[in-house]
């Protein structure tokens, strides 16, 4: 037994923790959990916990359903909303086959595989997400319009702003679980919040994002509201993104930094961005996996820009340009370790493991193939005409999930990154979602057409 496992078992005894929740994520990014008693944990570290993989979205067929969840002791944390005695803790799991080999259906393994390839190239991949979400007074299940929890706007600080107390309690919980927070504030739409997590290695960040979502929903329930990570719940307000800053390090050196280069951006950094741009359309179905995701991307960002609504619609990059898909942020002089790129397409409903894996694969492809970075866009891309964008070589992102899936289906990069099992399941599941949406007669159609046709 290693020291981390010993620490977990000792902590369970010292803090009177009677329940240990073992977490993992299905292919669509939904959190799954099984609780074990502390007495069973030593065996779980050695052998894992068996479960029916065919009951988990995208994991296995019924005739090959036996799977194992093996806890990762490095992810052990006590759940702060179960602080009373006896307490409850959690660990993330790796999903294995009965013979002990990794399950190709496990999103965490998909990311681990991508990170192993990155390590072979001499890099460490870091990510830093800015997570937006809405607080709602209600959560109607009949499809009717929800009500935001407040009427505040961008950076508003008012006594009636429910978000202030919410963010304070949520951040306290996150930090008690070892998840560091950099910033928090009210976003541009009524009820919309943003909390930015401190950068970490990509696997830790993905685990943190999954924890973050549960903490937000838990705190919201305690405060009598509801938290949603739906990309765009209101047609007239900005949607919720998960802008993510990416960087590669070689040891302690930031591989994106080069003194004297334009924007201090190294050849590695420029090729990484070029890879993100070249493969942006084909990875879009992963980073923006819901029908609703494309309402955020194409839902009038030019009208809501400056109010937190800068969702990118076009494939381009720019220096400090929030209308671009990829932004090279400014950073303070001397802070060379802060050199990074920001991808602005992700929404807060994405599976972080799969999203980080395909973003990394796209960037590494640019490095390995020596992609040349096209000229940057320093103007407001939304304000340009279609002809002006075409002249600059700026193409649009997919208009909807169906278009994104068609591009993904033809992508060798996405297929290789996700692996055959996840790739095939994802396409089947999302095609079904798209077909259901296409055949749905919407309230918009009834409202517009029924009175006049």
Predicted regions and their residues:
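Glycine-rich, acidic/polar active-site loops that bind/position phosphate-bearing ligands
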Residues: 1-453
